[in-house]
Amino acid sequence: MAQTITQLYYHVVFATKNRIEIIREDIEDELYAYIGGILNNHGSKLLIGNGTSNHSHFLLSLSKNLLIPSIVGTIKRDSSKWIKTKGGILTKFGWQDGYSAFTVGNSQLAAVKKYIANQKEHHKKHLFEDEMRGFYRKYDIPFDEKYVWD
C-alpha cells in the first residue's frame, strides 16, 4: 500500500491512587475536556470520557503514531498536574500506576459509548473492582488479584 490507514479505538480505564474518592463532579467536565485536549495535541480524539469519584473510563481514537502505554502515561501525568492546580485536597491527587485498555471494534462503538456515559448509574450497583474483574473475564485476560489493585 502506498499509505498507512488505520482506525484504532481503545476503551481505557484507570483509577485514582488507592481508589480514593477524590474526583469532584464540579471538575469532571473540565477534566475530560483537558484530556481531550491532550489527545488532540497528539493527533488523536477522546470520543467520550466519564467515571466516578475514584476512576475514569475513556473511549479513544488513537493516531497510528502512538503507543497505548506512552499516551496513557502522558494523559495521567498531565491531567494529574492539572488536577493539582484546583487546590485543596486535590493538591494530593494521583492516578494509580497501572491501567486497563481494551480494543474496540467499529460495531461496538455505540455500546461502549453508552456504557461509559452511564458510569454513575452503573456504579450505584456495581463496585469498580467487580467491574474490572468482569472485563478481564469477558475478554479472557489472565490476572492476579495481588497485582491488579494498588
Model feature map: region roles:
Residues 1-150:
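Basic nucleic-acid-binding interfaces
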